Regions:
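Mid-domain, small-residue-enriched loop/turn segments at the edges of structured enzyme/sensor domains
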Residues: 1-55
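Domain-terminus/edge residues, biased toward the C-terminal soluble/receptor-binding domains
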Residues: 23, 41-245
């Protein structure tokens, strides 16, 4: 829609968008992020909010491609109609190192040296944010430290948290009743008895919940009889079928 003040309309949309992302400590006052001279004001954000924005941005394939580029050339047409080629080089000195797949730097006197980036190691993607670093090198050092700290606290746990075994020597997850049998139960194991889940060791206790299907009639080995769900602090980290064994 047409507007008399396109910039104000755009900034309003920016603030509305980040609120929908769950950002509670962010205020945009211009579209470019400068905060000095004629742009001085109350613009602000938090590391948490910037991480939410980075996470959302990385859902866009074009943005993922751009931040993963070391350098590129773009063609622009000036106001006089003349075409120009411009070289664009990345300021992300961590790109391609230890799983870093992209990032965005930013610097002002008030904000200091800032950097948000994305890492992906073995399919586990995270987003880091460093604000108000003292030097450009320090923001990258701090970023690498954050990423290594997180991945250093990842661990794998067995979904089958039991020492009991079925007759077939698989983990005994449950004994499930069958409505047609009053004196028998069905041994249940995991669809993949060796399955593991990856958790963050500092994120809280891992709990397990087993759900049972209503069973009747003939039940064969390998038939689904329920499911098991692993959670860590109410965050679902794994779900797997239980099968008759």
């Amino acid at each position: 829609p047409k507007t008399k003040d396109a910039e104000a309309t755009f900034v309003k949309a920016m603030n509305e968008r980040v609120k929908k992302l769950g950002c509670t400590g962010t205020l945009f006052e211009n579209p470019h992020g400068l905060d000095f001279d004629e742009w001085a004001g109350d613009m602000h954000s938090t590391a948490h909010d910037v991480a939410l924005m980075m996470q959302e941005a990385m859902k866009n394939d074009t943005i993922r491609e751009v931040v993963a580029s070391e350098d590129s050339w773009i063609e622009v047409t000036g106001a006089d109609g003349t075409d120009h080629s411009h070289s664009m080089d990345t300021h992300n000195y961590l790109l391609g190192q230890d799983g870093n797949i992209g990032g965005k730097t930013g610097t002002t006197d008030d904000a200091g040296y800032c950097f948000t980036s994305a890492y992906n190691r073995d399919g586990d993607e995270i987003y880091t944010v460093v604000l108000n670093s003292t030097t450009t090198d320090q923001r990258f050092t701090d970023t690498a430290t954050l990423a290594n700290w997180y991945y250093g606290h990842k661990m794998t746990v067995a979904i089958a948290n039991t020492q009991e075994k079925t007759a077939n020597d698989n983990p005994l997850m449950a004994r499930i009743s069958q409505t047609d049998w009053t004196d028998k139960t069905i041994d249940a194991t995991l669809a993949d008895p060796t399955a593991q889940a990856t958790v963050f060791s500092l994120a809280g206790e891992v709990t397990e919940k087993v759900s049972y299907d209503d069973l009747s009639g003939t039940v064969h080995v390998g038939d689904k009889v329920g499911s098991v769900t692993l959670k860590q602090d109410d965050t679902k980290i794994a779900v797997m079928d239980l099968v008759a064994d």
